[in-house]
């Protein structure tokens, strides 16, 4: 199951880019650094071409992010996306994913939004923006809803990733704290994230 793979990998790299070539460079740096789950956002021009290119990559678990409507979800799934992430909950996206039997991670902030997403059949939600609430918010949510799987995006860094997991997240989305500097910098940061993740799992 894709959900289990995301949890096992622990880290989802949120990849943005001004062009396919730029995004591809970031992806390769992440893969070299050991991060296998890659969320390619719709802010990348012609992102579906890139999804198609990497959908059968042996090491990569490719998903799509910044999905705002059903057509975007459908096009990305058609290209080979294994999971779909959106900044907020979308009924349209939910229906497409349910129909195509593809994992959907809707963005949620409040407990009411999380309950709505779960009522619609979703097991994992994206807590976004994560840095608004911080890691302790996850523990507070999981007290009354222990079975919800949470992936925070925004505010997760090498320095605080262990705090997020200590408070009960299932995996984390990392973007700007990973995708910065040179490609070598990104690869080294990815390695640092993976090293920290290995310690958390141990």
Regions found by a protein language model. Give the residues of each.
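Conserved N-terminal beta1-alpha1 strand-loop-helix module at the mouth
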Residues: 1-82, 99, 147, 158-159, ...
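Glycine-rich beta-to-alpha transition loops that act as phosphate-gripper elements at the mouths
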Residues: 16-19, 64-70, 86-90, 106-111, ...
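Aromatic/hydrophobic pocket-lining residues that form π-stacking "cages" and hydrophobic walls in ligand
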Residues: 26, 93, 97, 113, ...
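Conserved functional loop/turn residues at catalytic and ligand-binding sites
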Residues: 34, 58, 80, 88, ...
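Conserved beta-strand positions in the central sheet of alpha/beta enzyme cores
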Residues: 39, 63, 85, 105-106, ...
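Catalytic cores of alpha/beta
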Residues: 69-79, 112-120, 137, 156-172
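Glycine-rich phosphate-binding active-site loops on the catalytic face of alpha/beta enzymes
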Residues: 83, 87-93, 127-135, 167-189
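Histidine/lysine/aspartate-rich catalytic loop segments that bind and position anionic ligands
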Residues: 87-123, 127-131
